[in-house]
Amino acid sequence: MGKYEDMLIEHDYIEVIECDNLPKRLSGLWLGDMILINRNLPITSKLETLAEELAHNELTYGNIVDQSSFNHRKFEGYARRLAYEKLVPLKDIVKAFLQGIHNLYELANFFEVTESFVLQSIEHYKQKY
């Protein structure tokens, strides 16, 4: 079982539905007590989307789909940063290095996320620290 399935089990109190009728620009959507995820995404992207939508459940409120509002973009950033920290914890980057993982591809496989997500996570940590 992978991290996506583990996260689904850990958060079984929230209904997660994989569907194929979300707007093209959305990989997932949090609707109060339900999360919709685009079923056509690769499993790595589903994990990233689930983590971000769970972060929205934890941190934000209301409809923030319209990103033209500064506050909506701010809330989106909060959720994304929490997803980075949950899926690519700093201590686990060190752990991966100590296990002999020295390139982006292997690091993405280690965390079961996309290479892009690993790079964004590292950039987040650079800005944070």
Where in this protein do the model-derived segments appear?
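Active-site hotspot residues in diverse enzymes, especially metal/ion-binding acidic/histidine motifs
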Residues: 1-129
